[in-house]
């Protein structure tokens, strides 16, 4: 579920917040092994009401709220990781 998307007009980029559903592709591998599209950065997440810094060794879990920065043209590809 995309909770919120903001367009950074002058940067041709988007910031999106996703709520991670059970079974989402993004929950199956460490961040570093997901093969996220170039130009994508996971800026952080909220797990159980607490902010968490994300590293390549982070494993995202269902129910996490994840903030993603990406080029505007990549948002549809990113959404597939959260479905």
Segments from the language model and where they lie:
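Flexible, Lys/Arg-rich cytosolic regulatory linkers and terminal tails that connect or flank
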Residues: 1-25
